[in-house]
Amino acid sequence: MTRVGILLMNLGGPERIKDVGPFLYNLFSDPEIIRIPIPFFQKPLAWLISTLRSSRSQQAYQSIGGGSPLRRITEQQARELQSELRQRGVNATSYVAMRYWHPFTESAVSDIKADGINQVVVLPLYPQFSISTSGSSFRELRRLREADPQFRKLPIRCIRSWFNNEGYIASMAKLIEDEILLCNDPENAHIFFTAHGVPKSYVEEAGDPYKDEIEDCSILIIDQLEKALGYINPYTLSYQSRVGPEEWLQPYTEDVLAELGESGTKELVVVPISFVSEHIETLQEIDIEYKEIAKEHGIDNFRRVRALDTYPMFIKGLADLVTSCLEGPEISLDEASKLPDRVKLYPQEKWQWGWNNSAEVWNGRVAMFVFIICLLELVIGNGPLHYLGLL
């Protein structure tokens, strides 16, 4: 019987406070997270940003218990999905591959090879595709595949995007419905979709489909809610988690919260539409920061819809995705990782950065430059790093 490996891909997150700095470094080292024209400076810049942001990020993780629950929840999702698939007669084993923290994709690939898996289905835990999330994970997996003759022999099928999956839409709608019915005035409760933002240039210059898929997804959920409730609530879509001075997708979540409060909205049902697990953006950014902004602007009842986690209907929806992928037309790893023609990324391998002879001189020069910049800003209290929000 064919042994199928289900590779669940996600972002990853620091499980302890001391992991925050290295996690941020891995995140900002990815040219699909921060795109710069000179690839040599990618890793030095990642070191600088992660160093300057570590303290603030550590405080955020401390406020939710000292670390991210993302690995624990993703591994629970993997176990539940494996169980559901086996009940359906699929000889499946689930694996977790995190992009920026443990267990890394490379570790999952090693386990897949050791277990004698015959076929792999790749399922990113991002309902909506973006070059910076699913795309980055697909391309990391392709890089590992190209470098590994044994792994290259394994048939791989990919699920590129699933924002319109029936189980996902139904699960989201049901959890939103439950919160709406707890409001004092359910028919007038305002549904507030908040998605993780991406730079506007990703969509307008690079052709990222993320914005379209987020918007289509929110409409599908609203349609499902109307069938269940018999009425349409007012709703708004916004984007959160912006970093740096570059313009990101708008409207920004904090701005819309202020506008809704000032326009008289009293009951808000907040929906983290692009997140399928509880993590820092839901537990700290939404539950603490955005809730405080809402209260300051007169929104009395701030209700946040919980993340899907291992919600049974959601797990069944994921299982449907896998079985359809196995039975339907093949989407290869090359197809899934393909970028729009306009995207320009810079392979880090072409640029040395580390403690070796070829890099040591440049390491010293860059480090000295960074040190001088930081020292000047600390002395004068102003400059580009303050403008970027890093100091």
Swiss-Prot record:
Its EC number is 4.98.1.1. GO terms for biological process: heme biosynthetic process. Fe cation binds at residues 196, 281. Keywords: Cytoplasm, Heme biosynthesis, Iron, Lyase, Metal-binding, Porphyrin biosynthesis. Pfam families: Ferrochelatase (PF00762). It catalyses: heme b + 2 H(+) = protoporphyrin IX + Fe(2+). It comes from the Bacteria. InterPro entries: Ferrochelatase, Ferrochelatase_AS, Ferrochelatase_C, Ferrochelatase_N. It is found in: Cytoplasm. GO terms for molecular function: ferrochelatase activity; metal ion binding. PROSITE patterns: FERROCHELATASE. Belongs to the ferrochelatase family. Catalyzes the ferrous insertion into protoporphyrin IX. This is Ferrochelatase. It comes from Prochlorococcus marinus (strain MIT 9211).
